[in-house]
Design a protein with these regions (language model features):
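Charged, low-complexity
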Residues: 1-103, 156, 175-181, 185-187
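Generic structural signal for beta-strand residues in well-ordered domains
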Residues: 75, 82, 98, 110, ...
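Short, conserved clusters of charged catalytic residues that mark active-site
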Residues: 77, 88, 116-119, 144, ...
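Conserved SF1/SF2 helicase motif Ia
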Residues: 100-104, 108-147, 157
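Conserved nucleic-acid-binding Ia/Ib motif block in the N-terminal RecA-like helicase ATPase lobe
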Residues: 132, 136-182
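Glycine-rich nucleotide phosphate-binding loop and flanking beta-alpha elements
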Residues: 143, 188-189
């Protein structure tokens, strides 16, 4: 191992994790939980550097690597509706939630992110967690969310916020009791 390689690896790690020079000099750095996947990815490529990973970090790392094998199963009413990759997306959301984190589902349009999120929200409701949840999307998709909610998760009450100010004021009276409130980016401004 060449020292230059180790220093380069340390520099890359520092850039990835945005560590201060003082933290590096101290030999100890604490990072927020949401940085664990980034840290794990960065450490996997550092063959010349030694790192101590505690049990909690190893457990978190394993759970993110094994999302597909997690114990989270979609709500019974959606289990046979979701495709395999959608069940994986559901498990990803549940894994993140299990650590108090949020995340983003991103793929090509039309692959079912809406139903993945709805399955997650239904599971939260079934487990007794208090809703409502707010969905902010393009105006062209507000009614789509409401239709998908009625189709796949009729157990969730959904309020689609649209229309003029008077209509929206009437809808606002329903928000507290709704499981899901859907609105557009424009109306959120």
């Amino acid at each position: 191992l060449r020292l230059d390689d180790s220093l380069e690896g340390l520099d890359e790690l520092n850039d990835t994790l945005e560590l201060s020079g003082a933290k590096l000099k101290s030999g100890h750095a604490e990072l927020p939980l949401y940085r664990a996947p980034s840290l794990d990815w960065a450490l996997s490529g550092q063959n010349g550097l030694r790192f101590n990973r505690d049990d909690a970090f190893r457990r978190i790392s394993r759970s993110f690597h094994a999302v597909k094998d997690s114990e989270y199963t979609p709500p019974e009413s959606l289990h046979n509706v979701l495709r395999k990759y959608q069940r994986d997306g559901y498990r990803w959301l549940r894994t993140l939630d299990g650590y108090g984190m949020g995340g983003i589902l991103a793929d090509d349009m039309g692959l079912g992110k809406t139903v993945q999120v709805l399955s997650y929200l239904l599971a939260m409701k079934e487990s007794g967690q208090r809703l409502p949840s707010l969905i902010v999307c393009p105006a062209s998709l507000v009614l789509n969310w409401q239709e998908e909610c009625q189709k796949f998760t009729p157990q969730l009450s959904c309020v689609a916020v649209d229309g003029d100010a008077t209509h929206r004021a009437e809808l606002a009276k329903q928000w507290a009791e709704a499981d899901l409130v859907v609105t557009s980016y424009d109306l959120m401004r």
